[in-house]
Amino acid sequence: MSLSIADQNKLDAFWSYCVKNRYFNIGYPESADFDYTMLERFLRFSINNCGDWGEYCNYLLNSFDFEKEVMEYFSGIFKIPFAESWGYVTNGGTESNMFGCYLGRELFPEGTLYYSKDTHYSVAKIVKLLRIKSQLVESQPDGEMDYDDLINKIRTSGERHPIIFANIGTTVRGAVDNIAEIQKRIAALGIPREDYYLHADAALSGMILPFVEDPQPFTFADGIDSIGVSGHKMIGSPIPCGIVVAKKANVDRISVEIDYISAHDKTISGSRNGHTPLMMWAAVRSHTDAEWHRRIGHSLNMAKYAVDRFKAAGIDALCHKNSITVVFPKPSEWVWKKHCLATSGNVAHLITTAHHLDSSRIDALIDDVIADLAQRAA
């Protein structure tokens, strides 16, 4: 392959742009401090993980052995015996959540999906794509699901097989829906546990809660049926990806044998990226639990620092327990555009992922927020 000088210059300019902005991100959940140079040699191969990593596939260039070890790792931290679980490395959180909702719908074809107003915007798309009945549930002011509204809507509709979409860290506020409370409330309606489905969206917090001293309930041991976590958020990856883990008994219900690849297909996508399982494998194999604890602890400390700085300046700021998402009043456009902040309604947030080794980016942002408030008050 060869490029014209103009095209090569365009690539070189983009390289310089990427180098300059590698660690810019403070407004979105993405860790930029990864190093997968040991995997660069594999980019010369078309690695395709079509089908089930646990079975033979007629496409030989796959990374199934590595994907299996990735799934074994996540089954462990999400507290389900590996032999009783199944999942795969997805294209990202949306596919992971779609897989969970798909399983719920296949188990309960007439069931209604309940999700809160603070749920990620992709779930509304999933509802349309799966053509699944749904009801939007109110959120509490801090972003957590309104359990009274959830139960009222289940009761009013007469739904006997609800499909619950629980947030383990909401997109904007980082709130964690209470898995134990949801199950207790549904049990009080007289609905047995085996008659409803509970999916957990842990895109960011799924790699935080396993490594803190007092995590909120979020695992299979706590009662979930499936869970999704992102690979590019807390772990870090040059290619967006995710991991979904579910109960094998439920997944077996959707398995289809495909003669074209001589394998069973259980996944949403057919051809699947074989490079991202290598990256997730390298990440989990190169970090001990102690190192994850240190990494998560540093991010949590940075979030606390941000909250303390905001409050010292008289600015209201919110950060949930075990969260690295700090919510504060939405500043003027020049501030949120300069710092590439995510905004929603009258709030904005910053996220202290692990590439923020010191407080410099946080300080620069908060200084601008303070200056903005002074300008508006003048």
From Swiss-Prot:
Cofactor(s) for this UniProt protein: pyridoxal 5'-phosphate
N6-(pyridoxal phosphate)lysine modifications at: 233
Coiled-coil features, chain-numbered ranges: none
Protein name as catalogued: Histidine decarboxylase
UniProtKB keywords: Decarboxylase, Lyase, Pyridoxal phosphate
Gene3D superfamilies: Type I PLP-dependent aspartate aminotransferase-like (Major domain)
Residues the record lists as binding substrate: 120
EC number: 4.1.1.22
